[in-house]
């Protein structure tokens, strides 16, 4: 009621409606009685019609989200619906007198770091599986009627035929093709190690006893770099315990990669020994995307939310009874909204040391393309200073959409590769997307653990 009244007080004078889950509980508890209640569903038009008639017989029947596909989840399979099944459901909805708003009619892109996330289960998880953090991919193509790049799909033409038949109008079978281009391979010959240039990239550095969250640093997206130094205590084996990592942390000791920790996923211990001169610990935490649906939105802070502790192992394999708390941190904000401070060289990138790569390529201005990054493992890409988004070898997305309006005759490409393998990085722009390539299934636990 407060939300509606605020909109009215601000001069909004259009009809209001709500989008509700396909359950009578959600209809009755997620809406106001005098507000037009739309329903979100796919397929079961008869059941939805009965629920809508029972709840609001005085309003037109409205599919506020008529699902034609689903968003892509990193590490999960691309969920597709066939053109025939969507067109058949659309026909039944029209014949039932249901007004339809396709979700999505046209796919889109979560450029930069703007992808969302869920606290839920993967679509192939078994019933009763625990909820976990699931980030969405950069692409929001969602197998829509019109693709991420504006290309009408077979699903579009199938639904177009259904609508023409329902309206008793002739079917226009003409097709539209959105042009796309392929470039020559792009050699990224210049490098800039991230940890070496963190001070230049940082927008704010704060010293604190315990790690600060991204929000307390006044930062919304990107990365945080936490740094501390541990003196030499003894020669025992130490394990770093990161409590509440949000969302993915790369750990380094004196510049050497020690391991990765991921939110809600078990991993091998991040272990090390402290040399006589001591050890500098750097923890690079990536915000993988903010939860955009459900109660968990309000709790989704980013960074290291809890304490960092040391688990100490004795020579006989036992551990001391309590943990040692790690204090005295430097917290650096790395939103990566401005890369102009980077200083590149032609030195090779060190293996497992996050590094920016830069190269140049020629393209036809105004013509779309898709940046193929399957040669990398995980990172982000910028073309002519514009943040395209993330890539990740776990799939299913392997290309990033590049709108033609971003391109010039000569272009600069910068790629941040979080896990370089020590070899030169070469990528290419191709004329088609790769959005459903996945080499293994849902569990990302292999992404967490010790080097």
Model-identified regions with their sequence ranges:
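Active-site neighborhood of glycoside hydrolase catalytic domains
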Residues: 1-32
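Catalytic-core region of carbohydrate-active enzymes that cleave or remodel glycosidic bonds
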Residues: 10, 40-147, 151, 162
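A cross-kingdom feature marking solvent-exposed beta-strand/loop segments within repeated
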Residues: 132-133, 152-155, 211-212, 216, ...
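Catalytic cores of secreted or luminal carbohydrate-active enzymes
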Residues: 148-223, 286, 297-341
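Short beta-strands within extracellular/lumenal beta-sheet-rich domains
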Residues: 220-231, 351-362, 398
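Aromatic-lined ligand-binding clefts that engage carbohydrates, nucleic acids, or primary amines
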Residues: 236-252, 281, 361-384, 391-392, ...
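Glycine/proline-rich low-complexity spacer/linker segments in large multi-domain proteins
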Residues: 286-322, 420-451
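Compositionally biased low-complexity segments at domain edges in trafficked proteins
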Residues: 311-364, 443-451
